[in-house]
Regions:
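Aromatic-lined carbohydrate-recognition surfaces of secreted/lumenal glycan-active proteins
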Residues: 16, 143, 150-173, 222-236, ...
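Glycoside hydrolase catalytic-domain groove-lining segments
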Residues: 59-78, 180-236
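Conserved, mostly hydrophobic/aromatic
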Residues: 45, 112, 186-188, 260
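C-terminal outer-membrane/trafficking sorting elements
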Residues: 299-373
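An active-site-proximal structural segment forming one wall of the substrate-binding cleft
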Residues: 87-114, 135-153, 177, 250-252
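Distinct, well-ordered alpha-helical segments
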Residues: 27-30, 166-183, 239-240
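Active-site groove signature of glycoside hydrolases
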Residues: 99-135, 157-164
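N-terminal carbohydrate-binding/catalytic regions of secreted carbohydrate-active enzymes
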Residues: 16-106, 210, 238-257, 263-287
């Protein structure tokens, strides 16, 4: 695997912004209200579109809200009424193709995440849904089928997002088994919630307890990773402290995460109090966490000097570097947010292949050569 130097991604903040009423949408008013609440701009705006019910025209109004706000719309594209084999067999092709044409005409970047949380038992495409006939194989094929239609229509402004739920539900579900392949995915993401004690079956869980298993399972997929849905109840613990802890993890052992999208809507009484502003303490913790992540972005160490002609690869868990000429340099390892994970001592390299002695070599990192004069 060749890991060429790439531009690091700044940490991004997004939300399903919620709002008044039972079915609030990301209108400009609701988006602005959430931005006022958190005291900063939203990079990503969440929207949920249902197959056949929400065509591109329904989506476009919110895509334009995002565009006018200087944000990117992230569409959770829900194939309600279809199982995976239905999609593979082309039963939704007309709707998908029309949507693709609309996205192409829109022209701005948009993120689409179809078939999200397929490792659960609650959606028609879920592997764990009893009697639905879904498998890891046909869910992955359904995802590829959707992407292929967009390619046939010449759509180039989509970032494809594959999402796993933080935990499996139902027989046969796996965290990564329905991954459609690197060719069909731009970003990977995780959805997860701390239900606290808002349900008879639930208990308070830390951020790590909710997300660590899925985060580790995605370690071998070499794509940028973000949290597409997240929230915490107030019941059973301290929501503000939970949020603070979440950002601490983003800065340490979850450093691969380049964006987080809060699901800010408290639904029916029998679900969760997911809205960000269930307490002022929770809002303050969110604001402080965002400020912390932005500060890390601004102070991340950048490679010194000028990069030489070099490439990196991983083999059997070891990092190898190939240079085209002799040089004096150190190797710097970054995460996707541009934060330094490790830096080697300065040493002299001859032209050729060199094994780099690093304790943290992995396929999720960015490697650069810092050349010294």
């Amino acid at each position: 695997m060749i890991l060429a130097p790439v531009t690091a991604m700044a940490f991004q903040v997004g939300a399903w912004v919620g709002g008044p009423g039972q079915y609030p949408q990301p209108t400009q008013q609701n988006v602005q209200a959430f931005q006022d609440l958190q005291g900063t701009h939203l990079d990503l705006i969440s929207y949920f579109a249902l197959f056949d019910i929400n065509d591109w025209n329904a989506t476009a109004q919110y895509a334009n809200v995002a565009k006018n706000n200087g944000s990117t719309l992230v569409v959770t594209w829900m194939a309600n009424g279809y199982n995976a084999q239905d999609l593979v067999d082309g039963k939704a092709d007309e709707y998908i193709r029309d949507y693709a044409k609309g996205v192409k005409g829109y022209g701005e970047e948009i993120w689409l995440r179809p078939l999200h949380e397929a490792n659960g038992d609650w959606y028609d495409w879920g592997v764990g849904k009893a009697g639905a006939g879904n498998t890891d194989a046909n869910v992955a094929e359904a995802f590829r089928h959707i992407v292929k239609i967009f390619k046939e229509e010449g759509v180039t402004n989509v970032k494809w997002v594959w999402t796993t739920n933080a935990s499996n539900a139902g027989k046969g579900s796996t965290l990564t088994g329905n991954y459609p392949g690197d060719e069909y995915v731009d970003y990977i993401s995780i959805d997860g919630y701390n239900w606290g004690k808002c349900q008879s079956w639930s208990s308070w869980q830390t951020f790590s307890q909710v997300f660590k298993k899925a985060y580790n399972a995605l370690a071998n997929i070499n794509k940028p990773l973000f949290i597409a849905e997240i929230s915490s109840s107030e019941l059973g613990g301290n929501k503000a402290e939970w949020i603070t802890d979440m950002f601490e993890h983003f800065a340490t052992d979850f450093s691969r995460v380049f964006a987080v999208m809060w699901f800010s809507q408290s639904k029916e009484a029998n679900e969760g109090d997911w809205a960000l502003n269930t307490s002022q303490a929770a809002v303050d913790a969110w604001k402080a966490g965002i400020a912390k992540m932005k500060a890390i972005d601004n102070t991340a160490l950048k490679p010194a000097g000028r990069a030489s002609s070099s490439s990196f690869r991983l083999q059997d868990g070891k990092l190898y570097m190939q240079t085209s000429k002799a040089l004096k340099a150190s190797v710097v390892q970054f995460d996707y947010q541009g934060r330094v994970l490790w830096q080697s001592p300065v040493q002299h390299f001859t032209a050729g292949v060199h094994a780099i002695d690093t304790p943290k070599a992995n396929a999720q990192s960015i490697y650069k050569l810092s050349v010294k004069r």
